[in-house]
Amino acid sequence: MFEKAEDQAVPAVSFFDPALKEVRRRVFYQWSRTVSILCIFVLGVLSIFWGMQYSTESKLTELKVWVVDFDGQTDDYRTSSPLVGPAVIKKTQEFINSPDLHLGYIIKNASTFDNDPWVVRQAVYDEHAYAAVIINPNATSLLRAATTQHNASYDPTGAIQTITITARDQNTYYSYILPDLSLFQSAVLASFGPQWVQNLITNTKNLTAIPPQALNPAIGFTTIDLRPFTPAVAAPAVTIGLIYLIIIAFFNFPFLMPIHAQLIKPSPSNPPLKIPQWLIWRVCSNIAAYFFLSFFYSLVSLAFGIPFTNSPAPDTLSAENANAYGRGSFVVFWMLNWVGMAALGFPCENMAMVLGFPWSSFFLIFWVITNVATGFYAVELASVFYRWGYAWPLHRIVEALRTILFGTHSRIGVDFAVLFIWIAVSIAFFPAASSIMRWKMKRGWA
């Protein structure tokens, strides 16, 4: 029997055999069309990601840094001739007027903050500015006292505070803000030093009695990071690890769809399930699947030592890993990943039903790139075209995660609301997407 089947088999031919002429033409056409579509898609979608970083340096002024002079402006240290504050303000104005690339320095009056440096700290924590340079009320008074009273314990770094909050966006801080602030600080010290020495030479007879640190550098900066980005193992939880959240949500469909399909396939032993109830089952089972998948996804962060039991900290004090919800932070973290996975996964499932395979992989690439571009990078530094990124799921997930893990300024209510809107819209579209899939299957298109 096998020998007979082999005798009847059509013999294979070479690639350029005339018998394959029509097949070759069809294959070449389909190959060219598919590759062209892929090339156009790659050009278009990757341009979204590259465009997010295009001309970022020219938009650095969007990163606001307040410079507030309290020197000699409070009752305890009031003076008519402060030195430190005016010198810093003068150098700030030079930075603002400079054609060189720099952050968005803004000179603010102390009265705007009720002459209270702690109010400035609160404003930075509340994300009204990325950083603040505060010239302390006693900056000039302490410096002069060190020279007249020969105070050997004088600390130059007590003159000026630099307030940051790197957990807000570590990439932006480390790439742009901190390097520019370092240049600013060096410029202030280089400018103030000669001016101060000249002042001492004119008004002081015995320079040798002055503490060395009061001569040089005379003033300095204390950097206060309200919410440091630490430990390093937390980075995947708010960056690359979230890409896997999208991918896991996407592959929920091809793994579970064959299981769901058994309910609507009639057989001699069982009738098909009614379509409305089948859709309800699919939505509910997907939510349950996301529940368990997000739990094990969250367990990875717990297993590798990301803190989830630290107490919250006051907004204006520096604190590492000040978990916003104390010992309940892991549960909130898990719930956010659950809701986030649903917000990311349901659109994937809808598009998988509408587009079918392999074209649904296009949507996965688009979904990953647009979410990563607007979730991992500062939208403020991108073109106004990218403002839609504020409404994209991953941007909201990242923002809420930073609140849970580091205790940054909370907008977690808005973050969850946006994610629930994504889920609601996706579920509303779910029946239509399912109808399109079944319509295509009946015609053999899927």
Task: Please describe what each predicted stretch is.
Residues 1-233:
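Extracytoplasmic/periplasmic domains immediately adjacent to an N-terminal transmembrane anchor
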Residues 50-53, 231-446:
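Membrane-spanning alpha-helical segments of multipass transporters and channels
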